């Protein structure tokens, strides 16, 4: 891959993945240090530690909760930006837009879920927190499958299979983790459920990092134009737009 020909937008999903991963692990280590949770590699519980190392429990009390809220808010914002850019990227390349629109809506709902679970801690409002968790995991999983299908279908720069197959594998891994997580939770096997949850989140973040492969081919621009007093007619506007169609913003 020639770095000189790569768009700077490829770094957006990478920043999302690295920043969110680092932030969540900081929350984890703060909670372990404060004896709020016991470590993921513990064979048994430490004396005085009451909780399994779920992400929500790790970020439930200050100071970890402050970091957790900030990380989830920033992650939700970056995920929303990725969702919009991905939608714009694929819009001129898909004949039936419903799948692309579904991917945008699903990721927007997952982003909204991130803000709920990040700002409504488990002990403060468990119901809203769980709604946020369901939105994030549920629509996040749906997003992964939709984007995997779009990757194989659109085949940008003939890299559809190279990127699509790893996304299918990650989507299957995420789906398996979600199923295992709820099964283990229902059976009260909290240590293994917490480990699966961390694996699930890392798979999600790895998936988002793969968007860098396709974003490196695209340049996005924000165009600012001065307000004109003399309006063009609607037909003239359409005519100009049809003459200058690109897949850039």
From Swiss-Prot:
Ranges in the topological domain labelled Extracellular: 31-64, 119-130, 190-192
The chemistry this enzyme catalyses reads:
Ca(2+)(in) = Ca(2+)(out); Na(+)(in) = Na(+)(out); K(+)(in) = K(+)(out); Mg(2+)(in) = Mg(2+)(out)
Location in or out of the cell: Cell membrane; Lysosome membrane
Those parts of the protein on the Cytoplasmic side are 1-9, 86-97, 152-168, 214-249
Query: Among its keywords, does the record have Metal-binding?
Result: no
Tell me if Oxidoreductase is a UniProt keyword of this record.
Answer: no
What keywords would UniProt list here?
A: Cell membrane, Lysosome, Membrane, Transmembrane, Transmembrane helix
Look up the record and report any one GO term of the cellular component aspect. lysosomal membrane
Sequence intervals crossing the membrane: 10-30, 65-85, 98-118, 131-151, 169-189, 193-213
What GO molecular function annotations does the UniProt record carry, in alphabetical order?
mechanosensitive monoatomic cation channel activity
- GO term, biological process aspect, one: proprioception
The family line of this record is:
Belongs to the DRAM/TMEM150 family.
The job of this chain, per UniProt, is described as:
Nonselective cationic channel with high permeability to Ca(2+). Component of a mechanosensitive cation channel. Confers mechanically activated (MA) currents with slow inactivation kinetics. May contribute to proprioception.
Enumerate the PANTHER family for this protein: FASTING-INDUCIBLE INTEGRAL MEMBRANE PROTEIN TM6P1-RELATED (PTHR21324), TRANSMEMBRANE PROTEIN 150C (PTHR21324:SF7)
The protein in question is named: Transmembrane protein 150C
């Amino acid at each position: 891959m020639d770095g000189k020909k790569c768009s700077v937008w490829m770094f957006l999903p990478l920043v999302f993945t690295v920043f969110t991963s680092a932030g969540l692990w900081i929350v984890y280590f703060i909670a372990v240090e404060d004896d709020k949770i016991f470590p993921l590699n513990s064979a048994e519980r430490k004396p005085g530690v009451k909780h399994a190392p779920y992400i929500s429990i790790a970020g439930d009390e200050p100071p970890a909760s402050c970091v957790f809220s900030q990380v989830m808010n920033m992650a939700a914002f970056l995920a929303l930006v990725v969702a919009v850019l991905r939608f714009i990227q694929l819009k001129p390349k898909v004949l039936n837009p419903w799948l692309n629109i579904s991917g945008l809506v699903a990721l927007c709902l997952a982003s909204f879920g991130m803000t709920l679970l990040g700002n409504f801690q488990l002990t403060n409002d468990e119901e809203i927190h769980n709604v946020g968790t369901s939105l994030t995991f549920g629509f996040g999983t749906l997003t992964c499958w939709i984007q995997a299908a779009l990757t194989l279908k659109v085949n940008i720069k003939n890299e559809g299979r190279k990127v699509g197959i790893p996304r299918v594998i990650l989507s299957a891994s995420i789906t398996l983790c979600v199923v295992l997580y709820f099964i283990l939770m229902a059976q009260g096997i909290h240590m293994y459920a917490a480990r699966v949850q961390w694996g699930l989140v890392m798979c999600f973040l790895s998936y988002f990092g793969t968007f860098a492969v396709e974003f490196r081919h695209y340049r996005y621009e924000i165009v600012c134009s001065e307000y004109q007093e003399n309006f063009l007619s609607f037909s003239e506007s359409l005519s100009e737009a049809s003459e200058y169609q690109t897949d850039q913003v």
